[in-house]
Regions:
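Short basic/glycine-enriched coil/helix segment immediately N-terminal to the Walker B
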Residues: 36-49, 59-60, 68-76
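Inter-Walker segment of RecA-like/P-loop motor cores
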Residues: 2-49
């Protein structure tokens, strides 16, 4: 069985390759993009039995068209993988959402997160997206097995003082400043992010 792994962006294809231990390409590279067009097309099709396309929520209708023209549907099977909470295509159309909504294709929904199991931010984002309550109202709450996401409730008057205090604790604990992000509910004034 011959197969290829691809994703719409360089970063997504790198993550896919690192995670699987297999070579993964951008869809443009898979299709042999040049300024004159795509090397693989309806006349000269991809030679694979299977394609796995990750992060396909970012796949626009134009690139999807070129990808589908470059395969023989009698020979090649495609598995499109996406997280519906991820960003959509920045170009026209939302190919994957349209395919799902059409109900013309089999869809399997995965509900357990494996790759980020210990990540607090992913846990909070998932709980929030699924409507689960995650804040207990205790003032300071820490999330994740590796305690990498901290929620601190404070008054408007004490926000700057609290941020400085917590930031200093993180620096004193040896955490690289590049790994620290402070999120506030405003983007204006001296307290904005």
């Amino acid at each position: 069985l011959s197969f290829a792994l691809a994703a719409p962006t360089g970063k997504a294809s790198k993550v896919l390759g690192d995670f699987t231990g297999e070579d993964a390409k951008t869809i443009h590279r898979l299709l042999g993009y040049t300024p004159e067009g795509f090397m693989y097309n309806e006349e000269y099709q991809l030679p694979y039995d299977a394609l796995i396309i990750d992060e396909c929520s970012m796949l626009d209708i134009f690139l999807a068209k070129h990808l589908l023209l470059a395969i023989d549907p009698e020979k090649t099977r495609i598995l499109f993988v996406q997280d519906p909470a991820q960003i959509s295509s920045v170009s026209a159309g939302c190919f994957s959402r349209d395919c799902i909504d059409s109900k013309m294709f089999p869809v399997t929904t995965l509900t357990k997160i494996f790759r980020y199991n210990d990540d607090g931010l992913i846990k909070v984002a998932t709980d929030s997206r699924e409507g689960r309550e995650f804040l207990k109202g205790t003032g300071i709450e820490v999330f994740g097995d590796n305690k990498n996401y901290v929620f601190i409730e404070t008054s408007k008057e004490k926000t700057l003082e609290t941020v400085k205090k917590v930031y200093k604790k993180f620096i004193d604990a040896g955490i690289d400043p590049i790994d620290i992000a402070v999120l506030t509910p405003t983007n204006k004034h001296k307290l904005g992010t």
